[in-house]
Amino acid sequence: MRKQFVFLLPFLSRLYHVVIAGGERLTNGGFSPEINPFTPKASLVRYWNKQIHHQSPGSAFLLSKASPLTAVASATFAKLASENALPDRLPDFCSAANLFCFPDLGPTLEKHSNDVKFSVYDQRNFTNYGTIHPGGADSFKKYSQNGNAVTDSFRRYSRDAAGHEDKFTGYADNSNVVEEKFNSYGTSATGGSGDFKNYQSGVNNPTTRFKAYSDEGNGRAQTFKTYTHEANSGPGQSFTSYGKNGNGAPNEFSSYGVSSNVIGSDFSNYGENGNAANDTFKGYGGDGNVPQNNFKSYGASGNAAVDTFLNYRDNANVGDDSFSSYAKNSNFEKVDFVNYGKSINPGSESFSGYGKGAEGNKIDFKTYTQNSTFKDYTKTGVEFAKYNRSSLGGGKTVNKWVEPGKFFRESMLKEGTLIWMPDIKDKMPKRSFLPRSIVSKLPFSTSKIAEIKRVFHANDNSTMEGIITDAVRECERPPTVSETKRCVGSAEDMIDFATSVLGRSVVLRTTESVAGSKEKVMIGKVNGINGGRVTKSVSCHQSLYPYLLYYCHSVPKVRVYESDLLDPKSKAKINHGIAICHMDTSAWGANHGAFMLLGSRPGQIEVCHWIFENDMNWAIAD
């Protein structure tokens, strides 16, 4: 026993010997006696000390991203991963490992027949609400606001109801990664209304699916007002079989997707076989950046419908709309396009099979653009007026969708300069790295998307499926000219990539906080890393994925700076920022946001940007 004890003592002392924190190496462990030295965090400490030169300061920032799993939990989940059994324990795994996962919302047979008011609610499954409900109203106010990874499911809601009203006000505002499902909502309902107001405003990565919504409804009105206003980058909304077989149902989309960034809408079999439908799209996609809208079999085989597109995609930047089999085989349908597609920079509109096989239809195009394509459409009953041969902005560079301060010139990094700070706040869900012992056993390739979906309970066409697919494809994208890249799901993998590019004498830096975001700040003391010389570095940016995943890459010919950021009035230090300047932009695209903002072209100027919250930069140690 004495020999065993003598053997273990120096081994354990090595486990406790050094920990990284606050830029220094701490002896005597750095752990409290209660912390197990076999945890993933302790393992990361040892790996850093093994791989990084002993004179390089440690990084409490990187250590904070380490897995919170206990030693026992880490070993348990690693074993489950090797046996492909993690899906059976996913909720436990997500909770213990601090992952980003959607809850599994299963259907329920519980019924709710009375009026309901939901205020300040979150993450619910609504099944059989308002079924066969005469009159009354349900109100959702300030529901799922300021949430993270919000998912709500509405199934068989207001089905067969009469005169029942539903109000969604301030729903899922300012939330991050939102998925809402409306299935068989208002089906076969008579009268009443559904009102969506200030719905998903300011949301990051919104997804809403309306399936069989108001199907076979009679005189039921739906209003979408200020829907996904100022939302950012997501699949947007999908309307499938919306109002199909409906009778006299007015639908209004007002201020829908206004000032949003890269948001899509998909209308499939919308109003099909409907009678006397009245749909109005007013101020739809206005001031948006690259909106994508797809209308497929919209109003097909309908009777006496009226569709109005007013100020649709007005003042938007680029964007694309596709109308396929729109109003096909319909009867006496009236469609009016007014100020359609008056984008600042031209997008494209495709009308295929438009009004084909229809009788007695009247379709007016007033003020539409040069990039409109009309293919296989009806030759009668269609009127074209004021065809715009040039876009509103004449194709000029527009910087309204590039946030002020997001890119700047190197000359701005001088003490005393006033500079606009962009919003550097991290918009991603909070997650942790997985230990290498687990992440190495998980599938991660486009050929194994089905396996990844199984692990993380991602259904077909779900938000999680899109998140997984987008991340994997971006990671497998070939590097750009002179770029070296790798996606990493563990801190150990990040250390390996950084040291493979820069060597083992490296320093990891990040911007200290988000203080000064979206405000003017004053540049304080500036320090050029590596003497301010042109050098190489590794930058790592978060990707949206269930576990913490970073896209790390290195490009040649950069300068890296650290600078104090001061309050312009008091001159007090409020932040310490890290900036990287790309000295060679010749391989960048001409439509890159930097050139829109700074007014130049690839290869003619250098471009600088800040390292945002929770992103990081590795550089060779001075």
Swiss-Prot record:
Residues 407-621 form the BURP domain. Glycans are attached at N125, N278, N371, N388, N461. Expressed in flowers and stems. Disruption phenotype: No visible phenotype. Atpgl1, atpgl2 and atpgl3 triple mutants produce smaller leaves and petioles. PROSITE patterns: BURP (PS51277). It is found in: Secreted, Extracellular space, Apoplast; Secreted, Cell wall. The keyword Cell inner membrane does not apply. Keywords: Apoplast, Cell wall, Glycoprotein, Repeat, Secreted, Signal. One of its GO terms (cellular component) is apoplast. The BURP domain located at the C-terminus has not been identified in non-plant proteins. Involved in cell size determination. This is Polygalacturonase 1 beta-like protein 1. The lineage of its organism: Eukaryota, Viridiplantae, Streptophyta, Embryophyta, Tracheophyta. The gene is PGL1.
